[in-house]
Design a protein with these regions (language model features):
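N-terminal capping/linker segments that flank leucine-rich repeat
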Residues: 1-26
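Short, intrinsically disordered, charge-balanced linker/junction segments flanking boundaries
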Residues: 7, 75-79
Length: 79
């Protein structure tokens, strides 16, 4: 998944969180290596088994996100 496609998924997820429209992010088993997810609101997102190695997750909201078996090796988790 490229950054532009990921940005669309995040936008729809954030809309789902705000008003129930849009859709919950299902990024399970996605290759998000080195993706920029900084400041993204991923509350409740499905990230099971995702490759997040080297991803920028700084200041992202990961509350209630499912990160089971996700690869976070080298990910930026500041904030």
């Amino acid at each position: 998944m490229n950054q532009a496609e990921l940005d669309v998924v995040i936008e729809k997820h954030e809309k789902w969180l705000r008003d129930g429209h849009g859709e919950r992010a299902n990024l399970s088993y996605a290759n998000l290596r080195r993706a920029n997810l900084s400041y993204a609101d991923l509350n409740g997102a499905d990230l099971r088994g995702a490759n997040l190695s080297g991803a920028n997750l700084s200041y992202a909201n990961l509350r209630r996100a499912n990160l089971s078996y996700a690869d976070l090796n080298g990910a930026d988790l500041r904030g």
